[in-house]
């Protein structure tokens, strides 16, 4: 089904937001925990707030000598003296010689406190006079001190002022010892150190810990399971992915913040004097910094459990630093540079506001926007958010082009490169990818050969006569994929040696072609697929997909349509088959929901498309089954259906038949054959039967090099593998016939097929055949076993044997091969290159008619399988490696 894909930022954002919401619904326990975790913290905070007794700390003040400067402090007083002592109070105040403008009277202490609350910075101290009697030497007063004022000697200054004035009025000239009866800090505090001062700074920064862990678990799991990267291969923009995470986390955090604030205000842990908007904005800014930290860690950590543990440890450490500063360093130093450095950690900047809030709540004061501590906290939180998101962008870009390996391939100064910004804004010249470089015919596959000096010694090896497609005169419009000296190297983490995963590979694949990529584990198949889909960056060389470079135009390649069936199952355990198809279809921009009747039609089209896609892989009956309940084969079929969404022109299938039964494999082969027109398909597989059935071209890789490439028949001819003819002589002939019993047959056979060869084991089998009976040499029994095992291996082809005539149908196979009682028939094998059916039929008919003449007991013929080609290539590679000198 062909569909017009509308890949836009908006459509992809809607698709991912829908996925996130659906995932939240599916994971109900985690979602409920995420929304209630903050309330659990706050409930503990409320309990501690109301159960832990206040710790009272008394400040000690020592008097200072007379003459200590007293100017500059406004005098606020309250008169509680009897009416007959009013004149005594006025005399005392006038004798202080303070300017009248600095003396302010309040009718009572409550009015003084209210004035202080409205503007704490305007009132430094206050005095409440209770009794002034000069005759009886009585001066009774209370000093109310602003506890936020930094000069702790102010109490002594005020005491000295009034005691010295009182002494002058009395005419006292000698030193008078005065006992200070009481000191009361202003306003009247319940404690000097309250629960709020500590618990806010400790508990509230941990409010978003669980939310941070959930962000990391989700994003790291999607990267670890390759879900994110497959989405990117299908056209997902990196920015859309992270914007979705920010939006989802912000919504989650806002709900958490509102719930927490309701609990705090409802339980009166916070008074209404604290502006709720200020508190909300502080929480919100701090939550943004946590999201940025989560994005940074998600790019650096490989497993969800490790990410969760690291985030917890990191946040606890930062909260500890914040507490150390607020409760210890702050009272020891007033260094602004130290504060600035610490406030670059958002828990420390947030802790500054929380400490101020706790003190104000303790003193029943209003926390104002103009307060320096509030301003500094807001300023540094904004700076932290900008800094953290910049670091997150930098880390993301470093790992962006090699996320399948989670390793750095870009330069650490990539942002200083002009080419980087050109690629960001699509300013790169199109000339670099407008025309494809032509392959050198001499380099099509033989680029991996040894030096010229060694070529002569291996001239006869089929590996030195590679058969490749991709001639230089191919029409560029017909080329789907072209690899040009593509190379990928790694550093072995243990030996530190350079490993060539893909070693200078060059070939082309035409449109409408299926290329089966074969090789042992570690041969470079997956690395090649990874470079073609952009999940791994090439070390050198390039590849062109529909004329676009994988190094410079990967975004365009993905936009134009590329399907990937990753070797891992890119599935969400909680989603059903239908939900997976719907998600990836929306990412591709298919059937985007609209309003009204048009929207209804698109939803109907989406439902029909889901049924069609699942029908192609025979999963309609599993439409509403969660993927975690599917078998391994069903998961692979679902992944294949996902890769076909949007009718991509390029299909990269990495082990699509893994875990499939024979019936499912046959069904997948038929599906790919139907989808093949106008598509370029590369599939890797270890199922050689499927490769032979599907592959228009078959490429065999070993040690990162292309060793052979061509159609199945071409490869068999290249390695002299077409048919295997097996003839058997009865064991009784060893006593009657001369040793050249097969000479007459071979003369006939090689006249018919002069390019055929006989098995190397034939000569040994003939020698053993006669030695057993004529010499009765027991030592040759071991040779018999060797010969029979070789011939058994040679005749163990998977195809159905064509039995022309069997003169002893009742004999057991093992008895025929001489494994019983040390006796066996003589078995000889001959290899024929691929021949037409008519030639083979004519030959077999003639051979059958002359079977008695040649004294042949049995004739069989099998067709060579791709397994034998694969084994030939592997054997040749092993021999070549053993011949190489070791350093």
Curated annotation (Swiss-Prot):
Keyword Cell division: no
Residues bound to ATP: 519-526
UniProt keyword Signal present: no
Region (Disordered): 443-474, 774-799
Localization, UniProt: Membrane
ABC transporter domain segment(s): 481-728
PANTHER family hit by this protein: ABC TRANSPORTER A FAMILY MEMBER 10-RELATED, ATP-BINDING CASSETTE TRANSPORTER SUBFAMILY A ABCA
Family to which this protein belongs: Belongs to the ABC transporter superfamily. ABCA family.
Listed name of the protein: ABC transporter A family member 10
Organism from which the protein derives: Dictyostelium discoideum
Lineage: Eukaryota, Amoebozoa, Evosea, Eumycetozoa, Dictyostelia
